[in-house]
């Protein structure tokens, strides 16, 4: 096993740990989930480039008769990338005292202002930054509003 294979195993383990945390652990942290809203995905061009480069590496490894374990590890990395970028649905998870957005816990007390843009993007102003929340279904904005009014 080469250092390349060890690095591939490390990246696969990191992506697998992220997927498990995102899917199973995060919804159970900080109390019961009051509301989970699916969000729009960001640009997919990055994911196409990532998976495309891995496919090129697989092709290069096969044509140069590289190690079989490297081919399998690259295939596993491509599958993990496909899951993370195309199958997994990003979501905002609301709890009693705060919410998870982009896998970061934000307490309701940190929200200084909220606005709704013309194109249906909920803008939350925190102390240092703005959160741009793009929901998949525009009707979910009303659910978020009702939840925030009831918890405040």
UniProtKB/Swiss-Prot annotation:
Belongs to the UPF0266 family. This is UPF0266 membrane protein YobD. Keywords: Cell inner membrane, Cell membrane, Membrane, Transmembrane, Transmembrane helix. The chain crosses the membrane at residues 6-26, 45-65, 67-87. Residues 27-44, 88-152 are cytoplasmic. It comes from Escherichia coli (strain K12). Signal peptide: none annotated. Its main location: membrane. NCBIfam families: PRK02913.1 (NF002791). It is a multi-pass membrane protein. GO terms for cellular component: plasma membrane. Residues 1-5, 66 are periplasmic. It is found in: Cell inner membrane.
